[in-house]
Swiss-Prot record:
InterPro entries: Ribosomal_bL34, Ribosomal_bL34_CS. It comes from Phytoplasma mali (strain AT). The keyword 4Fe-4S does not apply. It holds the Pfam family Ribosomal_L34. This is Large ribosomal subunit protein bL34. Gene3D superfamilies: 1.10.287.3980. One of its GO terms (molecular function) is structural constituent of ribosome. GO terms for cellular component: ribonucleoprotein complex; ribosome. The keyword Chaperone does not apply. Belongs to the bacterial ribosomal protein bL34 family. Keywords: Ribonucleoprotein, Ribosomal protein. It comes from the Bacteria. One of its GO terms (biological process) is translation.
Length: 44
């Protein structure tokens, strides 16, 4: 049986990257929440 997680840097960035987050309203909220919390890494 094939495992569910097949790592790919491109797919990771396109789905969870900064530009992907900023492009949606919900994503902007995620970034804002992480900024307010003081996270060092905002995305991925």
């Amino acid at each position: 049986m094939k495992r569910t997680y097949q790592p790919s840097k491109i797919k990771r960035q396109r789905t969870h990257g900064f530009r992907a987050r900023i492009s949606t309203i919900g994503g902007k909220r995620v970034i804002a929440a992480r900024r307010s919390k003081g996270r060092v890494r905002l995305t991925v």
